[in-house]
Amino acid sequence: MAQQTPLYEQHTLCGARMVDFHGWMMPLHYGSQIDEHHAVRTDAGMFDVSHMTIVDLRGSRTREFLRYLLANDVAKLTKSGKALYSGMLNASGGVIDDLIVYYFTEDFFRLVVNSATREKDLSWITQHAEPFGIEITVRDDLSMIAVQGPNAQAKAATLFNDAQRQAVEGMKPFFGVQAGDLFIATTGYTGEVGYEIALPNEKAADFWRALVEAGVKPCGLGARDTLRLEAGMNLYSQEMDETISPLAANMGWTIAWEPADRDFIGREALEAQREHGTEKLVGLVMTEKGVLRNELPVRFTDAQGNQHEGIITSGTFSPTLGYSIALARVPEGIGETAIVQIRNREMPVKVTKPVFVRNGKAVA
């Protein structure tokens, strides 16, 4: 039977259509996915992300351990509360998961990992942490609410006490701070500003209700997916998995190649891939009628006249832009246009960078 987050009852009270999402009963929408999407782009919306896994790591060798575990380098994290995004790779360079890591003190870091990959992530982390003497605490006592949109921070701040407001004042993106019962982070999965707020399970329902009263719109998985796709953000199992290199998933920027003597899991495989080349992730835009869908083939002819085929990893109608967009994994050599096979029609598409909307504005 699917698990329920501490906010399950609040979702039903708000009229949510609930679905099983990787073993969790989660809201798909609360009546209109489109309205929820627009609320985040123009005002403020919120998502229950309590199904994600928060993992606290403690020990004198925690930084050393994470420098080995992750492709990005936590040596960059020197200010308490600073976070970074990284892939956690296997020995062949495939992506076990993508995650956020927070630095608090030399012996205390926090990971936030995906729900669908929870068990394999915890197994992998535990296996590799043992030689470093790391104490691992899975924070199942915490719920998490993502409040996103141009007015999200101001509306959320109406629920904060003076100390909490002071703690987040002027906080830059990709930082987190513990302020009373709330862990407040300037992170998100929408391409908008906002907070991801972790708090004790028993306080989550009251906090959710207070956000509703503050004018923050409840949003479901449907809007979360169209928002992240417009923002060009990867979804695990679609843009990447254990067989796909981060170099083929627009995650090259998350690999810290320097210092050259840092050994991390997957490094040797990645260096070979970098030398020989990989596929790459691009954006596709189709302004004609129709919708680009996952797994549709993408065909193009390179400058030498050779024909190639890639695949759409995520596709949807963009509510913000009013036409169809997609992320696609394709061979090197693609130009500015390609063809997507939709049923029996060959549809022309424009090839772009894999990001379409940032802070409510079109960039594709």
Swiss-Prot record:
The encoding gene: gcvT
PANTHER family per record: AMINOMETHYLTRANSFERASE, AMINOMETHYLTRANSFERASE, MITOCHONDRIAL
SUPFAM superfamilies the UniProt entry points to: Aminomethyltransferase beta-barrel domain (SSF101790), Folate-binding domain (SSF103025)
GO cellular component assignments: cytosol; glycine cleavage complex
InterPro entries: GCS_T, GCS_T_bac, GCST_C, GCV_T_N, GcvT/YgfZ/DmdA, GcvT/YgfZ_C, TrmE/GcvT_dom1
GO MF term list: aminomethyltransferase activity; transaminase activity
EC number(s) recorded for this UniProt protein: 2.1.2.10
Record text on subunit structure and interactions: The glycine cleavage system is composed of four proteins: P, T, L and H.
Name of protein: Aminomethyltransferase
Keyword annotations: Aminotransferase, Transferase
Biological process terms in GO annotation: glycine decarboxylation via glycine cleavage system
One Pfam family of this chain: GCV_T_C
Disulfide bonds: none
Highest taxon of the lineage: Bacteria
Catalytic reaction(s) noted: N(6)-[(R)-S(8)-aminomethyldihydrolipoyl]-L-lysyl-[protein] + (6S)-5,6,7,8-tetrahydrofolate = N(6)-[(R)-dihydrolipoyl]-L-lysyl-[protein] + (6R)-5,10-methylene-5,6,7,8-tetrahydrofolate + NH4(+)
Family: Belongs to the GcvT family.
Keyword Magnesium in record: no
Role description: The glycine cleavage system catalyzes the degradation of glycine.
